[in-house]
Amino acid sequence: MNKFNKFYNNISEYYSNNIVTNFSPSNGYRLRCEFGYHNNSYLMHKNDKKIYLETFENAASCIQDLMPKILNQININESLKEKLFQINFRSNVNDDVMVSLIYHKKIDKNLIDIIKDISKYLKISFILRSKNYLYSTESTYFIDYIHNDAFKIYQTDNCFFQPNKFILPKMINTVISLINNPKDLLELYCGVGTFTLPLSKIFIKILATENNRNSIKCLNKAIITNNINNISNSRLSSNEVADLFMGKIFKRMGDINLSDYNFSHVLVDPPRSGLDDTTIEIIKNFKNIIYISCNPETYIDNIR
């Protein structure tokens, strides 16, 4: 039984209507890729085995094209190779690319000068990371555009962003299509605002929560850039949101008051581990729940 049929069988107990399945191409779809570096190659692990590669067919074509070029630059330069252990890529709808090189050593001026030259040569931005240190050849923010380029959105090199460039627009459009009689929205795990920004045109007000500091910074930057005035956000975990609804006061909420909201919908986009019991107890009191999941097993477990 393939994964689709397994999910259809598991969900049938709770949902009997037609299920629409969207597919992306099997290659060239990933906007975000992370690799180790070992033996002069990119390194991935699968089924406890090491896989060495020079390019990665699942990555967006702009990343695929760059991977051998960057690998060559690293391998011919001992300063770049030394104690390099991870190489991350991010790309966007314009095929811009940000590359992060992560080291187990102090980043010195020589390394910075080398990466500046490579950045100019390849016409891409680089991030150099080591413990408690970050250097960027350009901005530490990576810009992308969503919802038919209607919104400018920001990422950092280490915050979560939906990786599939073909499925993401369909996800946003599907969420929008599910909304009827919108009033105010509570959003948990809002990230950098992938859904928050387009939904701001549908709901009267949005209270968005997220535990990651960098993601909140990206969202705040996007709110200002896109001239949006109906999104409030706070750095809260899902457990803290549950505590908030049970009366706990958080200084991080500032002047945000729950009593000012008339929530008609809640949207959750949790990690693969799904929702904890406390969060489920809170959101099940909402009439309309939109649950975006990357793990069908925890999704089924949560809706039970």
Where are these regions (language model features)?
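Conserved AdoMet/S-adenosylmethionine-binding subsite of the radical SAM
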Residues: 64, 103, 281
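Rossmann-like S-adenosyl-L-methionine
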Residues: 2-6, 106-304
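Extended interfacial segments that mediate partner engagement and assembly in macromolecular machines
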Residues: 1-84, 93
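Short, well-ordered strand-loop elements centered on a beta-strand within folded domains, enriched
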Residues: 40-47, 95-102, 133-135
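A short interface-forming secondary-structure element
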Residues: 56, 99-109
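Nucleotide donor/acceptor-binding cores
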Residues: 31, 97, 182-183
